[in-house]
């Protein structure tokens, strides 16, 4: 805006007979210098109040803007349409967009009101010192054409214009109070959403840490089981070797016994030796039977240990899947948190930049960035160990 020569007006341009479910339109009007005839024509149309409006549909709509010109060619209009959002967006993204739209509208209304107050104060201070040439101040607040700033219209003011000014000031004051209340409510809602997000993120992190500890314990148990299985297999191989050696001794004893029986059946010494060999053979058979029982028992234990090992590996795989899901959730929430912070920073910068008025207002729409989180490949299945009895 150039000093006191230009005004910015935020008005509602939808017709009076508009349906309840139709699209709301907000118009920003930039008005420059006008001639006396044009100002008189504008003053005749100043029958309705100018007000700033925040659409109640902004909670579930996105913004679309359009730059057009009015019929008389003296003002530039930016129409902001509120359209429906897609249903697959997250709830907190909708809340952020709603806050962004409401804060933008509130900031525009606040800036317009502040500019109006400054201009009125400056004109009052300047015109009160010059009592000979300037007796009254006329401020016309007109719905389609904004504020009148022509010096020729400031010298005379009828009583009807003063009444309209008072009503417009009261209306703007109430509107600003409502907008400030909505801004405070939106800030409180945003703070509560941030606290809930932090609590959820902390809970997910605790669950991930607990899952990591449980996974480490299961891995230690699996390593211990594998060591025990290796020791049992080593003992089993030793017992099998000993079993083969005992069988060879039994065969040798039987061959020697048969030779002794065939050579000299009447020799006492041979008989005693044969009896001794028979006793040894009986003892060896008992040992072989005992070793067979022990071997079968060890095989059963090995099978049980292998089953336990497979069950433990299955549990570890399920824990890995759970941890991976939790990591994906944490990554997704962190990405959303970063996006939320970026949008809030952008909103704050945009609010600060609105303090300096430009000659033309332009609307920009932003598409939220998408973050794709690739899912890591699933772990390979563990090998199956089988023990075959011989």
UniProtKB/Swiss-Prot annotation:
InterPro entries named among the record's database cross-references: Tuftelin_GRINL1A/MYZAP/CCD68 (IPR051375)
Region listing for Disordered, in residue ranges: 358-390
Record's keyword terms, sorted: Biomineralization, Coiled coil, Palmoplantar keratoderma, Secreted
Keyword Disulfide bond listed: no
Gene Ontology process terms (BP): bone mineralization; odontogenesis
Tissues and organs where the protein is expressed, per its UniProt entry: Expressed in the epidermis (at protein level). Present in the extracellular enamel and is mainly associated with the crystal component.
Coiled coil: 88-126, 162-351
GO CC term, one of those recorded: I band
GO molecular function: structural constituent of skin epidermis; structural constituent of tooth enamel
Protein location: Secreted
Biological function: Involved in the structural organization of the epidermis. Involved in the mineralization and structural organization of enamel.
Subunit: Interacts with TFIP11.
Protein family membership: Belongs to the tuftelin family.
Medical condition linked: Woolly hair-skin fragility syndrome: An autosomal recessive genodermatosis characterized by woolly hair texture with slow hair growth, and skin fragility present at birth or appearing in the neonatal period. Skin fragility then resolves or only persists as minor skin peeling, predominantly affecting the palms and soles.
Descriptive protein name: Tuftelin
Species the sequence originates in: Homo sapiens
Organism ancestry: Eukaryota, Metazoa, Chordata, Craniata, Vertebrata
């Amino acid at each position: 805006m150039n000093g006191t020569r230009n005004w910015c007006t935020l008005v509602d341009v939808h017709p009076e007979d508009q349906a309840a479910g139709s699209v709301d339109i907000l118009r920003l009007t930039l008005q420059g210098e006008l001639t006396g005839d044009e100002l008189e024509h504008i003053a005749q149309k100043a029958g309705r109040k100018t007000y700033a409006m925040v659409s109640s549909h902004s909670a579930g709509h996105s913004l679309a803007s359009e730059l057009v010109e009015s019929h008389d060619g003296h003002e530039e209009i930016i129409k902001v349409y509120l359209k429906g959002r897609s249903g697959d967006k997250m709830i907190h993204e909708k809340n952020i967009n709603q806050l962004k739209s409401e804060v933008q509208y509130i900031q525009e209304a606040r800036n317009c009101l502040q500019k109006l107050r400054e201009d009125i104060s400056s004109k009052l201070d300047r015109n009160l010192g010059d009592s000979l040439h300037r007796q009254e101040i006329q401020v016309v607040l007109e719905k389609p054409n904004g504020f009148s700033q022509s010096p020729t219209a400031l010298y005379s003011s009828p009583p009807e214009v003063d009444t309209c000014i008072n009503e417009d000031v009261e209306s703007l004051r109430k509107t600003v109070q409502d907008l400030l209340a909505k801004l405070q409510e939106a800030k409180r809602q945003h703070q509560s959403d941030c606290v809930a997000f932090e609590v959820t993120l902390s809970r997910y992190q605790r669950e991930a840490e607990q899952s990591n500890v449980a996974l480490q314990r299961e891995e230690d148990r699996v390593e211990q089981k594998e060591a025990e299985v290796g020791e049992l297999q080593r003992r089993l191989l030793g017992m099998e070797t000993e079993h083969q050696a005992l069988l060879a001794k039994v065969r040798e004893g039987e061959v020697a016994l048969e030779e002794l029986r065939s050579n000299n059946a009447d020799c006492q010494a041979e008989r005693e030796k044969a009896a001794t060999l028979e006793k040894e053979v009986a003892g060896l058979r008992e040992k072989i039977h005992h070793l067979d029982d022990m071997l079968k028992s060890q095989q059963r234990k090995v099978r049980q240990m292998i089953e336990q090992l497979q069950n433990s590996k299955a549990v570890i795989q399920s824990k890995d899947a759970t941890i991976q899901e939790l990591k994906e959730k944490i990554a997704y929430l962190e990405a959303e948190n970063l996006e939320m912070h970026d949008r809030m920073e952008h909103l704050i910068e945009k609010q600060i930049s609105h303090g300096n008025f430009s000659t033309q207002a332009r609307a920009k729409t932003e598409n939220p960035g998408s973050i794709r989180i690739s899912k890591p490949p699933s772990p390979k299945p563990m090998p199956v160990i089988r023990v075959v009895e011989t």
